[in-house]
Amino acid sequence: MNGKLLALSLFSLSISHSVISAEINLYGTGGPHHALNEIVQKFKENDRFKDIKININPGPYTTWESCAKGLDKSCNTGPADILWGTSENYYAVLEDEFKKYGFTSKRSKSIYLRPAVILVQKGNPKHIHGIEDLINNPEVKRIVVNNHTLKSVMSATALWEDIVGRKGKLEDVEKFRSKIVYQASGSGTAAKAFLGNQQQEKTDAWITWPEWYHANTEKADMIEIEPDRVIYRDLNVSIKQGASEEATAFYDYLSSKEAFDIFQKYNIGK
C-alpha cells in the first residue's frame, strides 16, 4: 500500500510540475504583438491554462530567427511552437525558412485582415484626410514609409506604391515619392522616424498598420485611407508539427470569438 501511495504521489507531483512548467513560444514581426499579449491574458483565464507560460517574441525577423529555430542556446525562450506573419509575402519567407523545423503550409492559416492606415502627428496639424492630401497638399512635405531591404522581411513591402499607384497615375507616384524622407526597414525604426527626437525632425505622415496607432495614441492620430486606395494584408499563423496540446489549444484560440473581439480593438478584423 505504501508503495502504491508513493507511486501515486510521485505521479501527481509529475503532473503538477508538467502543468506549471508548460511553455508556448510564439515568434513574429512587431505590431500584432500588442493584441497577442492581451489575448494571452484572456486565454489564461481558463483554469486549465492559467499556469502555462506563453512567450510572445516580436521584432524584425533577423532578431529572433536563430532563437525560433533553436540554434542559439543563449536565448531566453525556446524554439518556436507558433509563428505569425503579417502578410502572405512574409509567410512565404517563414514557410521556406522553417520547413526544416517542423512548419508546413498544411499547419498554417490566415485568420484576420489589417487595413493600411495613415498616422499623423497628434491633432493632425497638416489637416491630412487621406492619400490625396499626401500627394497633392503642398504643406505635406515629410513622409515616412516602410520598405523591404536586402536583410529585412516585412508586411509593408511596396505598400506605399500599391496605394499611391492604385489609380494608374505616374504623376501620383512621382509627387508622393518626392516627399519620402525615410524608407524604414521595419516598423520600429519607422515609428522613431515618424515621432522624431532632438536630432531628427518629426514627419508629417507615416503609412503603416492600425496597431501602431494603438501603441502611440498619445502622440498620433489615425486617418483611414480612401476605399478606392486602401490595401489589406492578412495576419497568418503556423504551428509546428508535433506541437503540444497546450500550443494547439492556443493556436485554435487565436481564431475564436474571444480573440477576434480583442483583435478588433486594434482595427484587425475579417
Locate predicted features.
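Ligand-binding pocket segment of bilobal, Venus flytrap-like solute-binding proteins
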Residues: W64, L159-P227
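Ligand-binding cleft/hinge of the Venus flytrap
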Residues: Q41-R48, I131-S185
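Bacterial N-terminal signal peptides that target proteins for export
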Residues: M1-A7
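A conserved helix-loop-strand patch within extracytoplasmic ligand-binding domains
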Residues: N89-S152, A156-L159
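Periplasmic-binding protein-like
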Residues: L113-P115, N146-H148, H214-D252, L254-K270
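Early extracytoplasmic/lumenal segment of secretory-pathway proteins
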Residues: A22-L94
